[in-house]
Structure formats: structure tokens, C-alpha cells
Amino acid sequence: VSLAIAAFQNGHTVTVWDISQQIVDAILRDGEHKTKLPGVKIPKGIGFTTDPVCMEHSDMVVFVVPSLYIRSVAQRVKPYLDENVILVNASKGLEEKTFLTMSQVIQSEYPDNAVGVITGPSHAEEVGRGVPTTVVAASKNEAAAVQIQETFSSHTLRIYINTDPVGCEIGGALKNIIALAAGICDGLHCGDNTKAALMTRGIHEITNLGVKMGGRAETFGGLSGIGDLIVTCCSMHSRNRRAGILIGEGTSPSRRPSGLRK
């Protein structure tokens, strides 16, 4: 929804598709997403629907769904998209078994489309409130990266372009492991020295693995690498860090909030 607001404020026609009629009805009734973005008013000009036909004739479609469902959603909406639409991934993770990044999954389903990524140190809660934020728009197709940049940029959302989407996504996926460990450090009250060491060695390991997986080393020193790692290891918006804190404190899985049990 935060990206939808950003694009709408730049003069674009925006429709948000969701599989849940209950969520769509609640947003239309309340004028905000009280679960994900409480207090952030959504402009009335943004459409919300459960009908995927809304994607027909779109210039750009952004996937903002849990990584587990990226492939199934990409397959589900395929009848409504042609080869001219730019497909953008905004989810973080790797596909189970294949270890493909989310943009690679999308590209495998849409081999003829330009596919890009928008990623970096950005919590939706802050983007939606207009907190100054900087992220990366990445694509092997530089023109597509520029189009993503122009669609969402604002005076509070600065977007840099990059031609290494794989490296950008690997940084965004693997930092969650380090953030969980950082939370455990906090839960154990290990101190700043320990956490700094963990984060520093963590980005080193992410870089080494990321290069082996096809990313460029310099990518991991930027917003989608060290930047995303810092915000995820230090923010209470981060579910991985919060889960790590509970583990470090010895809280049993059954007593953790439902979203932090796994």
C-alpha cells in the first residue's frame, strides 16, 4: 500500500489487487489498512479489488506478496498480463528448493517481460508516513529500472538505480538470518560490541555467498546490502529481530505472538 500511495501521488492510476475480500472491504470502509499501516490515510483515488482483471493493460505490476507464494501468484495472474508490462518484485526471500530470488522466479514465468526489483532499508510503516527513505530500483534492463525509479520517487522517497537485481535481492533475503541472530544478542543482553561484530561478519558472509550466487560484490556495500542489514538488525519494526529477542530471552514458541513463532 505504501508503494501504491507513492505511485498515486506521482499522478499514476493505481489499483491494488488482494485475494481477501475482507481486507479489501475493510480498507474501503476505513480509508486505511489498520493491520499493516495503521494511521496512514489512503487516498480515495486508489482502487482496491479482488478481481485480477484489473491488471489488464497495465504498464507496471508490482508483486508485494510473501515469498512463499510468488510463483503461484505469478502463474495465477498470467492470463491478464502481456509481454509489455514491467514486472516488479518488492518481496524478500529465496524460493525453497530452487534458491532462486523472487525476480528470478517471476522471470522464469515471464521470460519475455522486463523484470525489476525495488528493495533496500525501508519499513512500509515509515514509507507510508513519509519518513525520508532511500531504496534501490534494480533490473538487468536499465530502462526498466529508470521507469521504476520515476514511478515511485518523491521528495521523501529517494530511489537509486542498479543493474544487479540478483545481488540486491540476495542481500535483502540473507540479512534476515543475521537480524534473527542480532535479536538473540539483544535478548541475551550481549552488548554493542557483540552485535557490531555479528553484523560486520554477517555482511562479509552475505557478500561471499552473494557473489557465488551471481551478485556483484559492490552491491552488498550499498543500500540493499549493508543498508538493509542495519535497519533490520536495529529496528523494532523487524519481525526477525523481535523473534530473535524472544528466543534470546528464553520465551517458548507457544508464548510468542503468532507471527513470530516460526
What are these regions (language model features)?
Residues Y69, Y80, V105-N113, P132-T219:
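Internal alpha-helical scaffold of NAD(P)-dependent oxidoreductase catalytic cores
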Residues A182-D186, V211-G221, G225-K262:
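NAD(P)-dependent Rossmann-like dehydrogenase/reductase catalytic/cofactor-binding core
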